């Protein structure tokens, strides 16, 4: 039996408060809206009761924010891509921001179990004046549990249409990619954090985003396998390779909190669900 599910969540600004409205079909839900930072920022948690995807499953997620709205979206646990008998498992996410909107897209990691055929697509469309901070974290197998990513494949697609496009296909059988110093060098966690603007960042702001990230990276144990770049005037990216998820997640959280403080004047405030 396969699961197909859709979830659409729209953030609007009403009398100084960001309000979330959602629609769903199948096993996808949004938990109660939370306001730990005040009415201006709405925190939401995506829940997928089946707990993972197998071959043939499809999840479609659509999130939007209107002018002046600020939404933060996360998950209570990892997205799990389990073994497939032939059909791929697909997750598609589309984030759409109107002018003046802000969004933080912070799901916990996706875990690719051995034998999976997984695809994870993320598309971000921003109007001029909109800004987004998000990340994408993928674990290949569970090395700490002696469950390696021995066979299977994972396809990743991250795009800001007309601005930035990254595609990757990771096959467990590709020993050069998985083990070569020019590839993943034996690491099993691949992670990216991105700051995306709907129009070009001015030079000072863009450089400050890079400098802030690089200072944090230099002081972190993963400094040899992490870096910050700006592939386009609207995008700044931090990339990390790590043996397991936890150190990569810790590094990205530090940069995320620094960026939201420097550029949005928002105090450090991690989603409560992460501490449960």
Swiss-Prot record:
Free-text function comment from the UniProt entry: Required for maturation of urease via the functional incorporation of the urease nickel metallocenter.
InterPro entries (alphabetical): UreD
PANTHER family named in the record: UREASE ACCESSORY PROTEIN D (PTHR33643:SF1)
Molecular function GO labels: nickel cation binding
Organism: Polaromonas sp. (strain JS666 / ATCC BAA-500)
Gene from which the chain derives: ureD
Keyword presence, Chaperone: yes
Quaternary structure and partners: UreD, UreF and UreG form a complex that acts as a GTP-hydrolysis-dependent molecular chaperone, activating the urease apoprotein by helping to assemble the nickel containing metallocenter of UreC. The UreE protein probably delivers the nickel.
Top-level taxon: Bacteria
Protein name: Urease accessory protein UreD
Localisation: Cytoplasm
Family statement drawn from the similarity comment of this UniProt entry: Belongs to the UreD family.
Pfam families: UreD (PF01774)
Main localization (coarse): cytoplasm
Cellular component terms (Gene Ontology): cytoplasm
UniProt entry keywords in alphabetical sequence: Chaperone, Cytoplasm, Nickel insertion
Keyword Amino-acid biosynthesis: no
């Amino acid at each position: 039996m396969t699961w197909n599910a859709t979830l659409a969540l729209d953030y609007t600004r009403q009398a100084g408060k960001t309000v979330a409205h959602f629609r769903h079909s199948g096993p996808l839900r949004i938990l109660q809206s939370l306001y730990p930072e005040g009415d201006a920022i709405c925190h939401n948690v995506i829940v997928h009761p089946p707990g993972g995807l197998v071959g043939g499953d499809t999840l479609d997620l659509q999130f939007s924010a209107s002018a002046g709205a600020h939404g933060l979206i996360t998950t209570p646990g990892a997205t799990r891509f389990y073994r497939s008998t032939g059909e791929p498992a697909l997750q598609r996410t589309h984030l759409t921001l109107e002018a003046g909107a802000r969004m933080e897209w912070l799901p916990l990691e996706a875990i690719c179990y051995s034998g999976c055929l997984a695809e994870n697509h993320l598309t971000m469309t921003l109007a001029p004046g909109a800004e987004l901070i998000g990340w994408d974290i993928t674990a290949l197998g569970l090395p700490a549990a002696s469950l390696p990513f021995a066979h299977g494949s994972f396809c990743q697609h991250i795009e800001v249409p007309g601005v930035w496009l990254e595609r990757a296909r990771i096959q467990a059988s590709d020993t050069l990619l998985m083990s070569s110093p020019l590839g993943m060098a034996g690491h099993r966690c691949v992670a990216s954090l991105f700051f995306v603007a709907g129009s070009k960042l001015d030079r000072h702001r863009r450089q400050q985003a890079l400098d802030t990230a690089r200072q944090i990276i230099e002081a972190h144990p993963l400094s040899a396998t992490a870096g910050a770049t700006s592939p386009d005037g609207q995008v700044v990216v931090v990339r990390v390779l790590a043996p397991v998820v936890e150190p990569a997640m810790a590094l990205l959280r530090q940069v995320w909190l620094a960026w939201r403080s420097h550029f949005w004047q928002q105090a450090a405030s991690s989603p409560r669900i992460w501490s449960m």
